Regions:
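Conserved CoA-thioester-binding segment of acyl-CoA-metabolizing enzymes
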Residues: 1-52, 87
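Catalytic-core regions built around general acid/base machinery
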Residues: 36, 81-93
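CoA-thioester-processing core
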Residues: 105-159, 189-193
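Well-ordered beta-strand positions
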Residues: 117-119, 158, 162-164, 170, ...
Length: 257
């Protein structure tokens, strides 16, 4: 695989996002994540999964530099597949923990909110959040339900409309993140929590997770093309397109310096 690195342990697998320094999400990463989680779901020897990133970046979100070059069909296909990935890992029944090794805005947060626990690297420079409104990407109804599940409807409503990125301390206070740890301890702490879960009877644990998520899952639009059709359509709105192109130009110019 080109965007992921798998580490197999005795009873679980660590899936590390491994696409450059910032793990920007593109079509290939989405496809590899879908395929990997399907295989891990079907593998009886895998009892749980940890999703981790690179040092300082869990994922910087969508790869706008690549996506801005997609044509209309490619954009619709991308959002449909990204929406499908979100639904599939939200419904992943085995223990699933995110080791957030740094920044996790927008698309990075989309991946993280599907997991059962989130442990994040401590540090003032690291942020997490569904800041789609602030970067002119239409958030889906399915994503708003995830935020509300973890932090409650009122706080989720406020933070989504503000396009707010949360510091680690804010994320813990809101219930979005379980704990902050030194960067070098994040993965190890996630493994300890997963090992705790694996001591329980697997069938009972999985049944309990399904019961806890029942109301959340019942609210999901099961048609990924429908859930993100607004995002795909608004991608081509001239004012939004101009802002995205300006952002991409400014970012690529910084990289050249």
């Amino acid at each position: 695989m080109n965007t992921l690195q798998l580490t197999k342990k005795q009873d679980y697998t660590i899936v590390q996002l491994n696409r450059g320094k910032v793990n920007a999400i593109n079509q290939e990463m989405v496809q590899e994540l879908r395929r990997t989680f399907q295989e891990l779901h079907n593998d009886p020897d895998v009892k749980g999964v940890i999703l981790s990133g690179q040092p300082h970046y869990f994922s910087a979100g969508l790869d706008l530099i690549e996506l801005i070059q997609y044509n209309e069909t490619q954009i619709h296909d991308f959002f449909a597949e990204f929406g499908t990935l979100y639904q599939e890992i939200t419904q992943f029944s085995k223990p699933f923990i995110s080791a957030i090794t740094g920044h996790s805005p927008a698309g990075g947060c989309v991946l993280a909110v599907t997991s059962d626990n989130r442990y994040m690297a401590a540090g003032d420079k690291y942020v997490i959040g569904l800041n789609e409104v602030a970067v002119n990407i239409q958030i889906s109804q399915n994503l708003t339900e995830a935020y509300a599940f973890w932090m409650g409807g009122g706080l989720a409503n406020r933070y989504i409309l503000e396009g707010k990125l949360l510091s680690g301390n804010e994320a813990v206070s809101a219930g979005l993140v379980d704990a902050l740890l030194p960067l070098e301890h994040v993965l190890g702490h996630a493994e300890l929590k997963l090992q705790q879960y694996l001591k329980a009877d697997q069938e009972i644990w999985i049944n309990t997770k399904k019961k806890l998520r029942k109301h959340w899952l019942n609210k999901l639009d099961q048609n990924p093309k429908n859930s993100l059709k607004e995002a795909a359509a608004l991608w081509w709105k001239p004012e939004i397109r101009a802002k995205m192109e300006a952002y991409v130009d400014s970012f690529t110019n910084k990289k050249k310096k």
